[in-house]
Amino acid sequence: QKRIDDGIISGWDVWWAMNSTSESDHQIVIVTLVENIEDFNNNPGIRSVFPDWSDEELEEFNQKNQAARTIIKTDLLAIKNRAAKQDSIPNVLVMNYMKVKPVNALAYEKMEDNYKKSNFENSNRASWGMAKRIDKYGTGLGWNYMTFDLYNNGAELMNSRVNTYEYPAELAKDFEIRDMVYSQTYVKWMALRKE
């Protein structure tokens, strides 16, 4: 919270992977939000949060922190588009991993923007976003874009998936510009913003 209040980051979320177990490839996703990409590595360290701690206390904290988790991977994304019907952070997050040929990137972003404009307000999603992966680049990546669907509860998500739709031919053609590689659902554990 202190890093948010000090303006170092703008948000910090912890999401639990729905239906994950100890055998799953991961159980938790931590999302750190920054306003400017230059701020991403602006981390003054744990001592700035606990300035009165001794070196021994800091070392003990770092050892416990490292022993309590295994970081599987990190990804760096830039938000390209978003929409929200409310100020609060919804409780359910769906991360949709997309693969788009670099030559089709701008057309894909425009397609998502048009789809958002025509469908978001009438959907049961509380928030939506699209992000571009910026830490790695190239056709060999498994995914390079992500869309986020956020719902207030699991029932809204499940109800959105029950119906099977026949897409209009033009929209179906637009969707061919990307492959939806996979989707992962998460439940909010905590979401911190400026107080």
Model-predicted regions and their roles:
Residues Q1-E195:
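Short S/T/G/P-rich N-terminal loop/turn motif that feeds into the first structured element of a domain
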